[in-house]
């Protein structure tokens, strides 16, 4: 698929469209995702086997002392199939950019945003799905969505001061009682069948996550009111927003966009790497994903959009709502000179404006152009990058996804900032579980890198320099 995409770009728009359509219909003969995977996996296994036989000893990169002390930043050490993050272009899902996904992925009737089901199909197969395939996936998830009674009881008895992410992680861990993989492994299943059970568990978990997340929301913020029943005629996002208690069509559209663009961001981020690592021990998808959610709950990973909103609210308190560019510029400089950062700006990998920010900005320009908070975000977009460039410290002065998402959620009435990371988690399931299926299909082994002590590292460096 990546080769088709690259070739399409080289051949120009007209031929590109033909190639994309060819790729789209290459897997259009079936609406059963598992059947399509069963056809794709042996071919990919053979391709990688040949590649490793020919190039297994090829050196990919060098590791420096700074990389080891610096969070392994920039170290090439993982194979992650579903997405790749380009510093200049942003995320590509199986070779497709966000604008391409917005254009090509199927949409709900009367909707304009891509359906997350379509993105999951793309992440798993490498192909843009048909509307029929996406409809099959929506119905399949609806069919698998019911929660076991012990998980419902557990959620209903959590104290209201327990953080929503702690509740999500605990509930997903408890869903491990339903794991097909864990039961089959205990009975001695063949390694060649691992992916099939991981697929079943992943499909079940993705189907159940909106129910878990909605129950958490209702218990914490809506006095424990019921989430209602899943409607098999609605898509995954629409059922989710219904269960949350939101009926605004635009909010459902925003949710479709949000769940699509937050789904995957290559394999080195904390949640994706955690899922990959825990899964490599043959922990089932429930345990692997729960571990990923504990990583996402960390303030350096999943809480950034909350920090942006807190900063924006504080900014408005201090300088007022109708602030001039000059006053705003002074406020930003005061923030930087006090040793703080401007939340929502910069990224560990990206060196341009995050395309996830851009598509949210376009949504806001279309649906809420006069919202005061959006106007402030748009004003910051004009000013902050220039200030950061003047300061000269930031490698990337441009806004990331977190600079915008919270403002959109607030506009539609979801003001409970502690809950935002749960939405992020529901979305991230699409990416990390698609990869988990492929990790078992390709037989990736237990992850076990070599560690060194500072003393050992110093001796090693001395031996090299001597």
From Swiss-Prot:
Residues engaged in binding oxaloacetate: 356, 428, 448
Effect after changing residue 395 to R: Inhibits methylation
PTM notes: Methylated. Trimethylation at Lys-395 by CSKMT decreases citrate synthase activity.
Reactions catalysed according to its record: oxaloacetate + acetyl-CoA + H2O = citrate + CoA + H(+)
PROSITE patterns, alphabetized: CITRATE_SYNTHASE (PS00480)
SUPFAM superfamilies: Citrate synthase
Residues annotated as transit peptide in the record: 1-27
InterPro entries reported for this sequence: Citrate_synth-like_lrg_a-sub, Citrate_synth-like_sm_a-sub, Citrate_synthase, Citrate_synthase_AS, Citrate_synthase_euk, Citrate_synthase_sf
Keywords: Acetylation, Methylation, Mitochondrion, Transferase, Transit peptide, Tricarboxylic acid cycle, Ubl conjugation
Effect of substituting residue 393 to R: Does not inhibit methylation
Family the UniProt entry places it in: Belongs to the citrate synthase family.
PANTHER family listed in its UniProt record: CITRATE SYNTHASE, CITRATE SYNTHASE, MITOCHONDRIAL
Protein name per Swiss-Prot or TrEMBL: Citrate synthase, mitochondrial
